[in-house]
Amino acid sequence: MRGEMSTSECRFAVRTHQLSKRYGEIEAVRHLDMNVPLGPISGFLGQNGAGKSTTLKMLMGAVRPSSGSGQIFGLNIADATQSVEIRKRAVFVSEDKRLYDYMTVEQIIRFTRSFFPKWRSDLEAKFLKHFPLPLDRRIKKLSKGMRTQLALLLGISRGAEMLVLDEPTEGLDPVAIETVLELLKSLAAEGMTILFSSHQVAEVEQIANYVFMIDRGELVVSSSVDRLKNGYRRLVAVFDTPVNGKDLAMGGVKRIGIAGAMVTLTVERDSERIIEHLRSLRARTIDVLPVTLKEIFLQNVGAK
């Protein structure tokens, strides 16, 4: 697995061991070992259908694992009593954003507030300032984006220690997405642990400190964002004549692009050795460039 974190690095809010979920013959999640650090923002990246939602639902007690184990704040996710305690300390905003359609926005805010003694009225007010939801409108008449905003308001305001968000920006316009991401950053700065799933790499790169990538039910990347990006480089070499791609295939080279006499390599670690190889092939110039999280995602997931 790429960039796996040492268990001695930090404390963890979430830990899983071989966590798996099978639906008939389909393995939705397979042998997941995932350690989510306590405190910062963690992004959970994967394509649609990769297993993100199933994983989060298992963590929050909405789906029972087929095998393996998991803990949140040291509490067993498969134990009914401990799962109740988990839901007191961690809030789950699911992808389907289920709400009571017959209520108005104001009614469901008031209704939800009554169940949570640690309700953050300051966050409620802050959220409504950024997203002036129509308080007298019934939920069934809200747009998809407004339903997402309302679900986030109800989750964020509960005063929990941790937010578990499944596709929290789904249905939002670019301005609203930016506002939500900035709000999540401010909550993390207060010490709240945030784990959110997304298939939008740019959102994860913008705010996440740690990233987990899942591909067809398997965890393929687990790392801090900075460490992961520092482990990759893009090398752009210009030759006097075209180069044979076979001469560029070597350990550490993850992707090769050739356009005439210009070669672009995506490399993982040990870039100096590969640079020396390019020089031995008589490269006229070699530029070393950073790699985006999107490129790393495509290398580990999308390119398969």
Regions found by a protein language model. Give the residues of each.
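C-terminal coupling/interaction segments
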Residues: 2-7, 266-304
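Short loop/turn segments at beta->alpha junctions
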Residues: 104, 224, 289-292
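Alpha-helix N-cap/helix-start and coil->helix boundary motif
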Residues: 20, 106, 201, 242, ...
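Conserved NTP-handling cores and scaffolds of large molecular machines
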Residues: 116, 232, 301-304
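Residues that line or immediately flank small-molecule/substrate-binding pockets and catalytic motifs
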Residues: 167, 239, 290
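ABC transporter nucleotide-binding domain
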Residues: 179-269
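ABC transporter nucleotide-binding domains
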Residues: 11-16, 21-196, 201-215, 221
